[in-house]
Amino acid sequence: ALSILKGLEKLAKMGIALTNCKATKKC
């Protein structure tokens, strides 16, 4: 179960990074 949580956390961080990237247009 822990590995799944860590995977979700990683995906969430990537999603946030992508959102920031698009918002600031610093891709």
Swiss-Prot record:
Give the keywords, sorted: Amphibian defense peptide, Antibiotic, Antimicrobial, Disulfide bond, Secreted
Question: Which tissues does the record link to its expression?
Answer: Expressed by the skin glands.
Please verify whether the record's keywords include Zinc-finger: no
**What main location does UniProt list?**
secreted
Some GO term, biological process aspect, for this entry: which one? defense response to Gram-negative bacterium
> Would you tell me the Gene Ontology cellular component terms?
extracellular region
Location in the cell reads: Secreted
What cystine linkages occur within this chain? Answer: 21-27
Q: Does the keyword Disulfide bond apply?
A: yes
What does this protein do, in the record's words?
A: Antimicrobial activity against Gram-negative bacterium E.coli.
Q: Which family does the record claim for this protein? A: Belongs to the frog skin active peptide (FSAP) family. Brevinin subfamily.
Protein name, entry field:
Palustrin-1d
Q: Organism source for this protein?
A: Lithobates palustris
Q: What is the lineage of its organism?
A: Eukaryota, Metazoa, Chordata, Craniata, Vertebrata
